[in-house]
């Protein structure tokens, strides 16, 4: 199911293979976010060409639109979307709990209002599992409570306890899954930014022995040093034979920090979100194409990059597309930023293979930061 093929000698970074129903996934792996089963401004064939083997879709959003009944009619999420690689489906917990004025948490589940039409709905660990089972997701995420940064200890403890209870119920549903369904269940550790809660949560989750473990509730607005502290601590509590997933990280700093600490999978909407506003990721920092300085620029966005944008079009032309609000500009920028993420991961993999990850991480981030400072 998960095989480690190389450990870096100077860090906890590692290379692995995660075996999933729709093909093996080489780790570390950046997972693009296709919330509704599609990447914004990117066709499936472009993603496949870039080498994407695992995409994230969101249960909350798919439940509200198009609806579970529609996806069930097609047989599963793969048939509905025609995506023939792997899907990880988030439980939707983060989205539900971000609706702070529109939801009520109970031991049984969570009552919430739709952000679309205000209609009321109720999620339980069992119902969320059932939806993902209908999707035939390759990786299923348990319903959890992602508590915000800055809450007090008692509230964090309560949410941690509920998350553990929901994990047990999800595992029970998973053990009774339909015959022939081979998706993997990842349970989620919580605990906010309190180490004793993190330890308690992780020990309880590990007792359930799910195929994979996610570290939830970090990268939620805390300072980077707090992120690093909890990331390192929580990752150290998880056995090395388990695939580890940190949810919602997508900047070069956070990703390389995660890889350094033995994390195998991560996702984020950031690369495509900033692309839609004309921000291009490069090895020298972020290039903001709407700036006047690029009007006459005949260079590619990044010489080393082999995406469609960088092999065919100039910075000046891309700026023209954005200023003209042409859809092609967003499509090209989105492809470029996803390609950048995959290139970054491949560079990290090469460094791990050569036991050079620590040096690579420092040199890469120094160069990236210098480019951003010189804007």
UniProtKB/Swiss-Prot annotation:
Residues 248-254, 272-276 are annotated as: RNA binding. This is Queuine tRNA-ribosyltransferase. One of its GO terms (biological process) is queuosine biosynthetic process. Keywords: Glycosyltransferase, Metal-binding, Queuosine biosynthesis, Transferase, tRNA processing, Zinc. Substrate binds at residues 90-94, 144, 190, 217. Its EC number is 2.4.2.29. The keyword tRNA processing applies. Binds 1 zinc ion per subunit. Belongs to the queuine tRNA-ribosyltransferase family. Zn(2+) binds at residues 305, 307, 310, 336. Catalyzes the base-exchange of a guanine (G) residue with the queuine precursor 7-aminomethyl-7-deazaguanine (PreQ1) at position 34 (anticodon wobble position) in tRNAs with GU(N) anticodons (tRNA-Asp, -Asn, -His and -Tyr). Catalysis occurs through a double-displacement mechanism. The nucleophile active site attacks the C1' of nucleotide 34 to detach the guanine base from the RNA, forming a covalent enzyme-RNA intermediate. The proton acceptor active site deprotonates the incoming PreQ1, allowing a nucleophilic attack on the C1' of the ribose to form the product. Pathway: tRNA modification; tRNA-queuosine biosynthesis. It comes from Borrelia duttonii (strain Ly). The gene is tgt. Homodimer. Within each dimer, one monomer is responsible for RNA recognition and catalysis, while the other monomer binds to the replacement base PreQ1.
